[in-house]
Structure formats: C-alpha cells, structure tokens
C-alpha cells in the first residue's frame, strides 16, 4: 500500500472517539476502556481495518484493538468505521491506536492480551532489515510480554521464503 500524506489526518485521529489517545495510561486497565470486560485481541499493523471490523461484528463477545503507526492508513480505517456506523453497525468492542508496535510492553500488562493478529505485514525482505519484521525474535519477545499464559499469535504472510 502506498502511503500518502493526507492533510488533516492527524487532527481527525486526535478528535476521533474510536482512537485511544495516550494508550500507556491504560496499561493494566484495558477492561475499563470497553463497555464489557471480555477477552482482548489486537491486530498489529491493521492497515485499513477491514479484518478487525469483520471480527468485531462476528464476535461481539471479544474486544479488539487495531494498532497502526501511519496516520494516513489509520484515517482510512476510521473513515470506514464511521461509514459502517452511519449505516447502523455498532462496534462497541473495537478501538484503534496510533502507535509503534515496539511500544506494546509499555501499553499492555503481562496477561492483558489473549491473541495477536499479524496479517500480511511488511516483509522487510533485506537481511539488514530483519529486526523490523513483526515476526522477528525481538517482536515475538514483546508479544510474550503482553500475552496471557496460553496466548496466541496468528499470522499470515504473502512471502514464504522469509
């Protein structure tokens, strides 16, 4: 996906009721963010958010947080959610965050996340960029710091030679 600077994206994100601002403050208290205290699943690098919006609709008994680090991409997810809500779909079990995934242990306590989704993340194919991959040892260690005892990381890749 080609990233473009979208004027007003940052302001729209800051003003959105669907985006958790200052997520570090919520550490250990994510159950209070949602209407109901339920298992928490996150998607790291959610893109335009379609996958999570579908899950949130199909599984109202699970809370979801979509994590994206690029304003322009997160804005598209917000616009899609607003469009769906205008058409009568309610997502009280879904929020978004604009944050770098390297900060996950500063945002979630150990045992706060039940499942992590990684869908078609940037493969960073060059060897010198291996640490940037969301499936690198460094990132897997971060996930371990926030998952419940038997938590899961589910990922889909488009490049099988990594």
Regions found by a protein language model. Give the residues of each.
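Conserved small/polar residues in nucleotide/adenosyl-binding loops
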Residues: 161-162
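Conserved beta-strand signature within the Rossmann-like core of class I S-adenosyl-L-methionine
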Residues: 149-157
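A short acidic, Gly/Pro-enriched loop at the edge of an enzyme's catalytic core
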Residues: 106-115, 120
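Class I SAM-dependent methyltransferase "Motif I" SAM/SAH-binding loop
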Residues: 44-47
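S-adenosyl-L-methionine
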Residues: 1-40, 50-57, 81-110
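Conserved SAM/SAH-binding beta-strand->alpha-helix loop
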Residues: 70
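A short glycine-rich, Lys/Arg-flanked "PGG" loop and its adjoining helix->strand segment in the class I
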Residues: 135-149
